[in-house]
């Protein structure tokens, strides 16, 4: 049906599979300290999972949609070779005017200058571009990271002694790639 005022909502039509593990280890004990019982406890947890699309109707293989084999949280981007060191170095490098927003917005300097990021020409066509943004033609785009948190862990410490109770809990994530957004 026609939708007025907004785009139609996305369909929940993908099949996916999540695989992972959880590990929890705990130790508690007590002993006498100055003729009084001292109880202590230590606990550690570690968990990880990966979610992958197993079925989705994306016949063109558009990389900005779900596709079979996609891991949730994928970050597609350009590979960085370094920085342009001089204002003329761009002459010996693949054209990147399509992907450099500073060049697109600046009417005075229409080429990369010293300090601009130098992207790698992965498809060898002397132009940095997104191709068709499909799996079969991603241009110079590649998977450069994943925003899904990996290896969540926690540590729980505590003791009881002579009417005094102490407990501390720490948690964190050991790996996560961060993407500031397309406008940064």
Predicted regions and their residues:
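Residue-level marker for the onset of beta-strands and adjacent loop->beta junctions
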Residues: 9, 53, 153-155
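Small-side-chain secondary-structure face that scaffolds active or pore-lining regions
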Residues: 2-18, 39, 169-184
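Short, glycine/acidic-rich beta->alpha junctions
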Residues: 146-153
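C-terminal beta-signal and adjacent terminal beta-strands/loops
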Residues: 52, 125, 143, 160-184
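Membrane-embedded beta-strands that build the outer-membrane beta-barrel scaffold
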Residues: 1, 19-29, 40-48, 153-159, ...
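Conserved small-residue
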Residues: 11-17, 21, 30-145, 178
């Amino acid at each position: 049906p026609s939708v007025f005022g907004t785009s139609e909502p996305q369909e929940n039509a993908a099949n996916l599979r999540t695989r992972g593990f959880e590990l929890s280890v705990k130790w508690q004990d007590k002993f006498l300290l100055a003729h009084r019982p001292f109880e202590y406890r230590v606990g550690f947890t570690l968990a990880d999972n990966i979610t992958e699309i197993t079925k989705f109707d994306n016949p063109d293989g558009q990389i900005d949609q779900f596709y079979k084999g996609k891991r949730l949280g994928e970050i597609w981007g350009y590979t960085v070779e370094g920085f342009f060191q001089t204002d003329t170095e761009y002459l010996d490098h693949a054209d990147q005017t399509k992907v450099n927003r500073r060049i697109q917005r600046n009417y005075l300097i229409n080429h990369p200058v010293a300090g601009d990021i130098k992207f790698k020409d992965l498809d060898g066509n002397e132009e940095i571009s997104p191709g068709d943004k499909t799996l079969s033609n991603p241009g110079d785009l590649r998977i450069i990271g994943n925003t899904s948190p990996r290896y969540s862990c926690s540590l729980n410490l505590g003791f009881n002694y002579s009417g005094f109770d102490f407990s501390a809990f720490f948690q964190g994530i050991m790996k996560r790639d961060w993407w500031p957004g397309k406008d940064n």
